[in-house]
Amino acid sequence: MKPLREPAFARLWIAAFFSETAEWMLQIALPVFVFQTTGSAATTALSIVLGLVPAVLLSPVAGVIADRWNRRLVLCVVCAGQAFVALPLLFVASGGPVFVIYGVMAAQAGLASLFEPARNALVPELVAPGELIGANGLMSINGSVARLAGGWAGGLLLGFGGLGWVVVAYLGVLVIGSALLARPFRRVAAPKAARPHEPVLRAWIDGLREIGREGRLRLAGVVVVLTSLAQGMFLVLFVVFVLDILDGTEGDVGLLRGVQALGGLAAGFAVATIARKVAPAALLGWGGLALGLLSALIWNLPALTASLGVFIGLFGVVGAPGVLAGSGLLSLVQTAASPERSGRVLSTVFAGTAGFTALGALVTGGLLDVLGTGVLLNVQAGLHTVSALVVLGVSASGKLRRDPIPAVPRSG
C-alpha cells in the first residue's frame, strides 16, 4: 500500500476508480439492452465491435498524445468528453432508435483509447521505481471494486429503471472523476522528455520498433493476441450464457460480471503487498493458467447444476487470476518499454487488445449458431490456457531478460 503515500498517485487512483466504475456501467448495460431489444447475438457482437474499432484506428494518435501532452490534462478532458458523448443515450432511453447506441459506443471507445495509455504511462511517474508492481496492484484493486460497483449498478439500474437511469448515474460518476483530475499533480521530478516537432506517424512507428526490438514486448504481443481473442468471445458468450443457459436476468448479468471483483480485490491486495516483488512473467503465466482452467470449469458446470449461488462463487474466484495475469502483463510492458516511448508502446498494446477483441466478438457472433455456445466457450477457455503455457515456457527457457525497473522522470 506504500504507493498511496504519494498524494498525486492517490488522487489518480481515486479518479481512476470513478472512471472505471462509469465504464463498467455502460459495458454491462448497453450489450444487455441491445440483446433484449433485438434478440440477436450477432447484433450484440456488432455493438461490441463498434465499441472497439476506434481504439485500433486512434492508436497512433493516442500513443503520441500520451507521450507528448500533459497526461493528467488528457485524462481530465477525456472524462468530460465521455460524459458529453453519452448524452444521446437519453434519446434512446425515451424510445429512440437502437443504432444510436452504436455511435455512442464508438465515441466512448475512441476517448477511452486516449485515456488508457495516458493513465498507465503516468503511473510509473508518480511512484518510486521499485513500487511499480505494487502500484499496478492497487490499480487492480480499484479496478475490481469499480467492476463490482459499476457492473452491479449497470445491471440493476437497467432492470429497475431502464437505460435512462443508467445514463444519469454514468454522467454523475464521470463528473466526479473529471473533478478529481482538474487540479495539477505536484511534480516530484523533472518532466518527461518530449519531441514536439516529430511527426505523429513517425513517432508511432518509433514505438512499434520498440516492440520489435524488445523480447519481453514481443512476448506480451503474443499474449495480447490470444487473450484478446478470448475476451472478445467472452463479451458475446457471457450474455448468452447467463440469459439462456443459466436462465438469468439482466440483474444477474451485472451481478455475475461484477462479482469477479471479489477475487480481484484479494489478488490486487496480494500484488500490492506480498507479491509486488514477483517477476511480471510469473504473475502473467500462472495467473493466466489458473484463469483458463477455472473458465473451463465454469463453462461446463451447467451440465451438473445451474444454481446461481454456485456461479456467484465461481465467478468471484475467477476474478483473482484475471487480476494477477493483468498486473503481470501491464508490469511486463511498463518495465520493458523505455520511458520516453511508454505511451506509444502502451497505446499499441491497447490497440492490439481492442482489435483482437473485436475480431473475437465478430467471429463468435458469426459462429454461434453453427458451433453452439458450449464449443465456443471451451475454445475461449483454451485460448487463455495456451497463452499462459507460452509465457511459462519462454520464462522457463531463460530467454526473458530480468532488467531492473527503470527510474523515470515524473510529471503531472
Residue positions per predicted region:
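Alpha-helical transmembrane-bundle signature of multi-pass membrane transport and export proteins
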Residues: 1-412
